[in-house]
Amino acid sequence: ILDTVLIKKPELLVGALGCTSVMEVLEQPEKFFNFMEESAKLFDIGKLQIAEIINKQSRRLTSREKKRIYEHPKAGTKVLEKIPSMQKYRDMILGHHKSWDGKMGYPKDFDNCASPDRMLIEILRISDCLDAATDFIGRSYGTAKNFAQCLEEFSLGKGTLYCQELIELLEGDAALQDELTYLLEAG
């Protein structure tokens, strides 16, 4: 997804990672790829503290277990707070469960709309949503979906739940859809 954004809509990344222009974004693709790769490794680090809940695959979660899951973004930032070089991932960790408009999701007190890395948070969030929704192994909260079903849900929520420009990019790029379908369903 990031590769397609960099090629087709680099203006969506202006402001992210300190880039102040499209030219700066285009001159530093590796900076974006490296940041997203590290973010993908770290964004759910708070789940390490609740592995016993995450691994409940045979039943629905209790309200207490759900509450602990909702706390994992903040728990993740606490894990990294003593490592100054990791602070750049803070917004990614906190924002990956917030809706695009910031009105839904958790943690409630994190304002993803104010983050300069908002678009990167959204790319990570959509990627995480796709991974979770298409996972057919070990889902305790629903049936796995295919990519087309996910894209339909994204389309219904564009502008509020999901970034309109990003979803329209997904909708309009058949090659990206094919690649994501393969990665999520066969790869």
Locate each region found by the language model.
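Short, function-defining helix-loop hinge/capping sites that tune catalysis or transport
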Residues: 51-52, 136, 171
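Histidine/acidic-rich helix-loop-helix segments that form or flank divalent-metal centers
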Residues: 14-40, 80-125, 140-143, 151-187
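Acidic/His-rich, divalent-metal-binding segments that scaffold phosphate/diphosphate chemistry
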Residues: 1-70, 77-81
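Conserved beta-strand-loop-short alpha-helix elements that form
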Residues: 121-135
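A broad detector of the eukaryotic-type serine/threonine protein kinase catalytic domain
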Residues: 74, 131-135, 155
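Acidic, Mg2+-coordinating active-site segments of isoprenoid diphosphate-utilizing enzymes
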Residues: 44-57, 97-106, 131
